């Protein structure tokens, strides 16, 4: 789902800094490290593991060997929970972490820890502030989820056979993912925050481009088979089996999911299901608090 770019930037910086703490923070001479500094490192390590394991996709792209960081990979691969309730829980969790962060006075930290403390504080504050704007973020548009998912999956790294199985499981979950997206969009509409018709129209065009591509030129087919061919640990029979499985999932799961999403969006285009005149607005800045959202 599309997110505020500043919020995403903070998340990326925070992730890098926390991972650096795991790699280097605890490796310093322990006799020269204060008790507070050790506790701070343990706190950051715990936060790092929590953020890294949010969903299978994030975990896979961020870390090649999660177990080396003490992170247990989910038994069932998942995109994570994209519901507004989950986003609100994330904001509540950020409040809890911020209070824990404040138990570490910066005067007792090293120079590097102080920098991490400051950036983590900014990130948590950004997350907390984002709660009132949760429904302002549309899952559609130029870089919305329907166009982003094929690109993201096409870049999913195959290091071993488990990666392939996890990938196919994620492909299989695209229908459920789109159901979450439509539920979120309906919640936005019920709150009188309506995606403009031109945004929905652009999204439908993206879906048509994806559906109209030939099988050989489909990104989820072409990229999958290229990555599969580069994995030397598989036999030709295994590769053929996974290739057939992937194509079957695309035909029986992915295409119908995109068709269903397209139909749902076509129904919503131009409809007036809101209780106010917001259905005529074409920019978020025209909504109440819309300009504040962009400033945020």
Describe each model-derived feature in a short phrase:
Residues 1-2, 20:
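Short, cationic/aromatic linear interface patches
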Residues 2-13:
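Bacterial N-terminal signal peptides that target proteins for export
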Residues 7, 20, 30-32:
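Intrinsically disordered/low-complexity terminal segments and short unstructured peptides
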Residues 15-19:
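Hydrophobic membrane-insertion alpha-helices, especially the h-region
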Residues 22-25:
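C-terminal motif of bacterial Sec signal peptides marking the signal peptidase cleavage site
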Residues 27-296:
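N-terminal maturation segment of proteins
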């Amino acid at each position: 789902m599309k997110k505020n770019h500043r919020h995403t930037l903070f998340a990326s910086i925070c992730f890098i800094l926390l991972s650096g703490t795991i790699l280097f923070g605890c490796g310093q001479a322990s006799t020269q490290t204060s008790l507070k500094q050790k506790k701070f490192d343990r706190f950051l390590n715990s936060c790092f593991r929590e953020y890294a394991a949010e969903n299978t996709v994030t975990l896979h792209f961020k870390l090649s060997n999660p177990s080396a960081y003490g992170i247990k990979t989910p038994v069932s691969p998942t995109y994570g929970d994209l519901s507004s309730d989950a986003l609100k829980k994330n904001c509540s969790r950020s409040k809890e972490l911020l209070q824990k962060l404040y138990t570490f006075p910066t005067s007792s930290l090293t120079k590097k820890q102080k920098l991490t403390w400051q950036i983590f504080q900014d990130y948590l504050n950004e997350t907390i502030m984002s709660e009132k704007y949760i429904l302002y973020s549309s899952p559609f548009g130029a870089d919305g989820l329907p166009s982003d998912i094929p690109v993201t999956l096409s870049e999913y790294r195959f290091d071993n056979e488990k990666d392939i199985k996890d990938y196919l499981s994620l492909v299989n979950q695209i229908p459920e993912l789109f159901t979450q997206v439509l539920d979120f969009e309906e919640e936005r509409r019920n709150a009188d925050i309506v995606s403009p018709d031109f945004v929905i129209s652009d999204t439908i065009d993206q879906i048509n481009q994806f559906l109209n591509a030939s099988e050989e030129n489909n990104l989820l087919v072409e990229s999958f088979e290229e990555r599969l061919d580069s994995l030397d640990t598989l036999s030709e029979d295994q590769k053929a089996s996974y290739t057939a499985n992937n194509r079957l999932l695309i035909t029986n799961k992915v295409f119908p999911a995109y068709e269903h999403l397209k139909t749902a969006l076509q129904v919503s285009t131009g409809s007036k299901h809101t209780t106010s005149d917001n259905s005529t607005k074409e920019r978020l800045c025209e909504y109440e608090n819309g300009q504040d959202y962009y400033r945020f």
